[in-house]
Amino acid sequence: MARTVVLITGCSSGIGLHLAVRLASDPSQSFKVYATLRDLKTQGRLWEAARALACPPGSLETLQLDVRDSKSVAAARERVTEGRVDVLVCNAGLGLLGPLEALGEDAVASVLDVNVVGTVRVLQAFLPDMKRRGSGRVLVTGSVGGLMGLPFNDVYCASKFALEGLCESLAVLLLPFGVHLSLIECGPVHTAFMEKVLGSPEEVLDRTDIHTFHRFYQYLAHSKQVFREAAQNPEEVAEVFLTALRAPKPTLRYFTTERFLPLLRMRLDDPSGSNYVTAMHREVFGDVPAKAEAGAEAGGGAGPGAEDEAGPSAVGDPELGDPPAAPQ
């Protein structure tokens, strides 16, 4: 019996790496996995994980694929020796964290290019053949940060909101083609996903006001707490992908955690958005009287409270991993 051919983007670490070796090592031996990476020099960890799980020979191959380059995507497609991809996993992504006014234009453009346009490039390369064959599955790494706004994740959330619209629109179209598309909505995950583009606290302060600077440190402290309490291992998240892949009638969305569903329901129940905005503000920052808000703006210098909240290494701290409820 022919094996199911799976191609996954973004396999140098995290969810992509763990999903690739999970499928390649599946006891059924029913998957042929193409794990793609932007830079093949980073494939060492992938093969270490494959050896640890005793992936059978021929179950896993690596391909160079840079979602920012349509020629690279097309070249990877041509190297799939079976001539087809049964399951496409769009997983490559970038994160971006910080006050909006402190983010560089190039960093903003890079996140949108990888997370949104990069996903479009991959879909454009592989969807037509699935439609012609009348079968196929597409799994896209989403985020609850694509379903609700998170402070200091403005651009990242914008990119994930865009994926929601892209995928939901395609899912409606693809029904009669026999192609199923599902979003895997992740919360915080223990990965090296987040790219810290901010410099020292002083550099951040130079690019924003003192009040926003204090708020950022409050957010970092909250983020670390949520990460400690709720972050999932990528192996656990990979099982949700497998559930979607094997479902007889896959749904549009699969959630890797239920922790954030109450906030999502609140957002849906109140189309005006006011209840969600108030609830999320309290969740992250607590109740701060208006007088204190004004005082923070008028105060001079960051003061000791800024570092006391989250510690002096909060900016760029690898322990932060993904932003709360916004992993991939």
UniProtKB/Swiss-Prot annotation:
Keyword match NADP: yes
Keyword Methyltransferase: no
Active site location: Y156 (proton acceptor)
InterPro entries in UniProt: 17beta_DH, NAD(P)-bd_dom_sf, Sc_DH/Rdtase_CS, SDR_fam
Domain of life of the native organism: Eukaryota
Reaction catalyzed: 17beta-estradiol + NAD(+) = estrone + NADH + H(+); 17beta-estradiol + NADP(+) = estrone + NADPH + H(+)
Location of the region described as Disordered in the Swiss-Prot/TrEMBL record: 290-328
Biological process terms in GO annotation: estrogen biosynthetic process
Gene Ontology MF terms: estradiol 17-beta-dehydrogenase [NAD(P)+] activity
Annotated positions binding substrate: S143
Gene Ontology CC: cytosol
Keyword annotations from UniProtKB, A to Z: Cytoplasm, Lipid biosynthesis, Lipid metabolism, NADP, Oxidoreductase, Steroid biosynthesis
Subcellular location field: Cytoplasm
Function statement: Favors the reduction of estrogens and androgens. Also has 20-alpha-HSD activity. Uses preferentially NADH.
Subunit structure: Homodimer.
Protein's name according to its UniProt entry: Estradiol 17-beta-dehydrogenase 1
